[in-house]
Every structure is written in C-alpha cells, then in structure tokens.
C-alpha cells in the first residue's frame, strides 16, 4: 500500500510536471530518493529542522558570488548609491529581511501554521512558476498581518 506522504508527493510531482516547474520536480525527486533509502531516517529530520537556514545560506552564497568574482566592487556600490532604483532596492531588501525575521519567529512559535504556508508555497511554485522562498517570507507577511489585527482587537 502506498503511504499518504508518498501519494501526496506523487500528486505534487504530477503538478510540477504539468506546470514544468523544475525546482519542484527536483525537490520531490530528491525527497523520494531520501525517503526510499536508508538516508531518509537521518537526512529528512535534519532538513526539516535546518532546511530553511540551509536554503537561506545557499541563496546568500549565490547573491554574494558577483562580489567574490570581482564583478561587483566598491566602484559599483558607489555608482549604485546615485540611483533612486538602488535606494528602492536597498529599502526592499531591508523590508524583506525584517519580514523574514518575523516569519521565522512565527514558524518557531506556531508550527501548525507551517502547513498552510507550505501548501500556499506549493501552489505558487507549481501553478504560477513562483520561487520557493515563500514559506519564510509568507510567514513574515502572516506575522505582520496578525500583529496588525491584534492592534485593532
């Protein structure tokens, strides 16, 4: 008999294939390999507890590569400060990081909310070709909205 988790992942794989979402397809295939081998017992719990931090680290490395390769240096930083688009990007980066901080708090304090956030991310990735940074940012947005609602109670 196929387990509920295997069936759920298989349905998501089909959605990923229909939507031609490579990230979702690869993620599910990796999870299947881990789940069906001896590696799953060790790696899946680690990924569940540390996966978001690991993902953020990988994204941070990717963002810093142009600095490491010398494509971006102090000259480009100075030139960027002359553009109002750069200032908008700077403010956006700060806002997103602060939202993510609140999201991390929410996911830590209310783990049951994770299910809704993960499902929302899956829908966005599979159907709208979104990027799976959603759970943390989504949790941050949810955290901010929840705090605003609390202010009016």
From Swiss-Prot:
Q: Does the keyword Amino-acid biosynthesis apply?
A: no
Membrane spanning residue stretches: 8-28, 54-74, 87-107, 117-137
Cellular location of this protein?
A: Cell membrane
Record keywords: Cell membrane, Membrane, Transmembrane, Transmembrane helix
Write out the GO cellular component annotations.
plasma membrane
Q: What top-level branch of life does the organism fall under?
A: Bacteria
Q: How does it sit in the membrane?
A: Multi-pass membrane protein
S-S bonds: none
Chief site of localization: membrane
Q: Which Pfam families match?
A: DUF441
Task: Read off the HAMAP family from this record.
Answer: UPF0756
Which PANTHER family does this UniProt record tie to the protein? UPF0756 MEMBRANE PROTEIN YEAL (PTHR38452:SF1)
Say which family it is in.
Answer: Belongs to the UPF0756 family.
* Protein name per its UniProtKB record: UPF0756 membrane protein Bcer98_3279
According to its UniProt entry, this protein's organism is: Bacillus cytotoxicus (strain DSM 22905 / CIP 110041 / 391-98 / NVH 391-98)
